[in-house]
Design a protein with these regions (language model features):
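TRNA-recognition modules of translation machinery and tRNA-sensing kinases, especially anticodon-binding
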Residues: 2-100
């Protein structure tokens, strides 16, 4: 099923990327995960890094800090990653996050 969706995305012009599974605090803050979702994220104190709660965090940070040339704004990226997060509320307790 994963390959089916990735193939469809690539056919629609998206480029598949393999993002990292660990991000720094700036990356998590820049995508709105911190401070709002801090209690749901896994933090590795020794390395000062967070496990990604969703692929969106590293994918949206790929061009962070870059100045893109005029007319070069149409990057279409997709990626598949494991997602590491504590499930909040009763939704996660009942299905253990398997539906997400």
């Amino acid at each position: 099923m994963i390959n089916f969706f990735l193939d469809r995305a690539e056919a629609a012009g998206y480029e598949e990327v393999i993002p990292p599974h660990l991000v720094n605090e700036d990356s998590a803050r820049g995508t709105g995960q911190l401070p709002d979702k801090e209690g749901q994220m896994y933090y590795m104190e020794k390395d000062d890094l967070y496990l990604i709660p969703t692929a969106e965090v590293p994918v949206t940070n790929i061009f962070r800090g870059d100045i893109l040339p005029e007319g070069d704004f149409s990057h279409k990226l997709c990626g598949y990653t494991p997602c590491f997060r504590r499930e909040a509320g009763s939704y996660g307790a009942h299905v253990r996050g398997l539906n997400r």
